[in-house]
């Protein structure tokens, strides 16, 4: 199994995409831990990172979510524009250490990725997982802390 493929199961986005700042501590914990349990039961690997829905976080989220919170430094707005060219243009603004937000359930985003990946590789970038990027930069991820980029 490749490192990138295995890392997919080390991150999660909660069970039902609820805004973690607007639910109780018990529900917040359930959203994250139940999802981690499901991922682990299917893959044998427990998730190690969380991307909070909407990027929503506050002190309560930071205190109760026992994982690093992975946000983004570039939002392609693919969910809003639904335009492949726009998504490509935004993603290609990335510089070393950026985290680019894209939604893998959209066909136009998948089409954009088919253009973005070779373009970034041609520019000399190595595409890695979030965990690999932070490790390469010597940045230790801490539970409850939010990260937008690795630099």
Short names for language-model regions:
Residues 15-148:
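Catalytic domains of cell-wall/extracellular-matrix polysaccharide-remodeling enzymes
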Residues 1-5, 9:
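Single conserved hydrophobic/aromatic residue that forms the stacking wall/gate
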């Amino acid at each position: 199994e490749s490192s990138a493929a295995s890392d997919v199961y080390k991150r999660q986005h909660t069970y039902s995409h609820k805004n973690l700042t607007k639910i109780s501590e018990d529900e917040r914990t359930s959203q994250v831990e139940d999802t981690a349990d499901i991922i682990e039961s299917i893959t044998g690997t427990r998730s190690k990172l969380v991307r909070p829905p909407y990027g929503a976080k506050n002190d309560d989220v930071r205190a109760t979510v026992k994982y690093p919170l992975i946000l983004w430094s570039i939002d392609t707005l693919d969910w809003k524009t639904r335009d492949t060219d726009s998504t490509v243009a935004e993603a290609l603004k990335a510089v070393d250490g950026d985290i680019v937000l894209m939604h893998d359930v959209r066909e136009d985003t998948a089409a954009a990725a088919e253009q973005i990946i070779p373009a970034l590789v041609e520019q000399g970038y190595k595409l890695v997982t979030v965990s690999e990027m932070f490790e390469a930069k010597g940045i230790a991820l801490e539970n409850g802390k939010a990260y937008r980029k690795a630099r």
